Amino acid sequence: MEDEGDSPIPRFASRGRAFVYVLPCRDEDLLKVGFSRDPLQRLQTLHARFFRFFDLDRAFLIGTDTVRDARRIERRYIETFADRRSPAPLVVPDAAAGYTEWYRGVHAEAEAIARTLAAEEGFTLHAPLRDWLRALFRERAALLFAWSAKMLEAIEYERFNTPLPRAPSTLERALRDALDCFDELAIDIEPLVPEPVFRWYREN
């Protein structure tokens, strides 16, 4: 159902370019450090509703031209904050959490390191992450109309063929998460989706 070419959720893993990510949790002084060629996919593996779980106004990316540079920067963070490691939040899947890259009470220092690296080595600092994500989602906004229509059609088929009561299905959660993400990024979804999809979103 969610063909990558049709989905409004961007995928863009590049061969050489990589990103170091620093992701503070919204509700506690805890953050995740790592690197990825596809930061959005990484966000989604950490939490399906990453846009509410992480603080997008304090999160940031460091863009590098090579994976080697990304690994080096990640290693610097790991070594600098070694004495401030913290367990991953329970809501983060074990397979996605990592074992040594969650830290408590280090956001200001992590941001200072990033700004120094950008100034001294020319890396691109994407801060806040919200702006980077908004630009990325706007690039794919034109795909949202057809994708959301397909999703709602499948949801309605499920609804009429599944006994009630029932919990929200995987398809319902996927559609709501996608629309909530656009909304969180201050992208007006009403003109981007069919009227029945917008009505479903507001009523469910």
Write out the residue ranges for each language-model feature.
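Non-catalytic accessory segments flanking enzymatic or RNA/DNA-binding domains
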Residues: M1-N204
